[in-house]
Amino acid sequence: MRNFLIGLAIVAAIGGYLFSQYWYYVPGIISAIADPVGENQPVTWQKGPAESSGDSRPPNIVLIVADDLGFNDITFYRGGIAGGSVPTPSINSIANEGLHFTNGYTGNGTCAPSRAALLTGRFATRVGFEFTPATPEFAQLVAGEGYIAENAVDYPPSDELGLPGSELTLPEMLDQRGYHSVALGKWHLGGGKGMTPTEQGFDEFLGFLPGGAMFMEEGDSQVVNSKQDFDPIDKFLWANLKYAVRFNDGDRFKPDSHMTDYLSRQAVRVIEDNRNRPFFLYLAYNAPHTPLQAEKDDYDALHHIADHTERTYAAMIRGLDRGIGDVLGALESHGLSDNTVVIFTSDNGGAGYVGLPDLNKPYRGWKITFFEGGIHTPYFIRWPAKIPAGGQYDSAVAHVDIFSTALAAAGVKLPQDRIIDGVNVLEYALQNPQPPLSRPLFWRTGGYKVVLQDGWKLQLQEQNDKTWLFNLNQDPTEQVNLSLGEEHSKKLKTLRATLYELDSQMAEPLWPTLIESPIAVDYTIDKLPDTAYETIIWSN
């Protein structure tokens, strides 16, 4: 008996040690049991009419959203990843053959709230979607001392975190004109009752409900992996994400290739099957978000890049651009290019936790900040039937505008029972001369609040009473904080009043924050200096 008890104690001690080291694997283990991943299965899309009716029809709409794409990841702005040595001709072509908006802004500095703004035309905080859905396990791992344990006590279960069904989404509105709407890829707006894509207006969905998925299985011979051991987010993703998609509300199964290629091929099929009716395709890639996994052929093609992480990341950009080229090619081959609105953007800026310093160059800040690096994004619209090639518009536009712009193109009136924060940007950009767009844009996460109007940007950090005022018209990279002197006190007072007025209109968060952590503005998380550096406090 004594030996048995000693053995039991040893087993318990070993088990306790292992749990203390690897407890963050628990969500993935539970998910694998409750929602197992099957082998690959074919996908049968609904088919539209065999022939076109010949009647005039509203334009198709293709909304392409990259995930954590840095402003400097593409070569359109004469930069690009790896010193511009990885061309992005397909992405660039959307801008070159249409309009590029020099001051495009995301809905938020993180993934999910931006997507809420994209699909509702409302500030994410007006919806109450202030924070990216997170489990307490994730928050505890990534936040460290910034973890708010008391808020985890009554924290809602994961299936209650998402976009409320009472919100009107873009596909729901487009249904008024007979659009067939398909969502591909990353959803991140909830997986509970009333929150899935097919319950939020999409006719069909193929992708993953949470905020990420593996691009391939880690041990696949055709994948190259790059793990960021210094990053707790990366550690959590490798431990818990699955290489899996689901079709509509079915069970999860494995794709048959690298996720980016898989989504691109499925998008081509959707275009083919719906070529004879108006369709809305929401193509939400998860590239180049971590975990960094590149297709081996793309990695091998970039032998000139010495750094393994940068090479893997660049290979993911290469695959993303190739996939977008295939989608554009499908539109062309079916004679749909002229009357298809193609919109390209990213959900937020590049992430400092990747460890690559130039992702958002020339801007300061990262994903998880409201500095320009976190929210200033590529924003392109192509519609050959209506938009002359090579256009440019310089006033600030944002993700909330995509809702209104797409509905105007489709001939659908905006809902009248709620505030819509976005506008039809083509109404401004296609005039000659182009009128400025002067309305304020607003962002908030906890006590970190920002307003932008007419090129003037005010950032307030209430937790530590910080203020930043920038004139982006003269200082687009936010180098000179004008709040520190008296010269711009009038502008500061005006913007502060605008910020507080907008802040008062926003909803209470749908769930509490679990994180309040300092985020470095100018350094990647693996290169934090020993001396003082500028931070913001991010709530989530």
Segments (PLM) and residue ranges:
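Histidine-centered active-site microenvironments of extracellular/periplasmic hydrolases
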Residues: K193-G201, P291-K296, I305-A306, G329-K386, ...
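Formylglycine-dependent
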Residues: P133-Y179, W187-N276, Y285-A294
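A short beta-strand-to-alpha-helix junction
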Residues: R57, I81-T88, T106-T110, P157-L168, ...
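C-terminal cap/loop subdomain of S1 sulfatases and analogous C-terminal strand-loop tails that border
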Residues: E204, F208-M216, G350-E372, I387-G391, ...
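Long, internal low-complexity/basic segments
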Residues: F4-P59, A66, F71, H100, ...
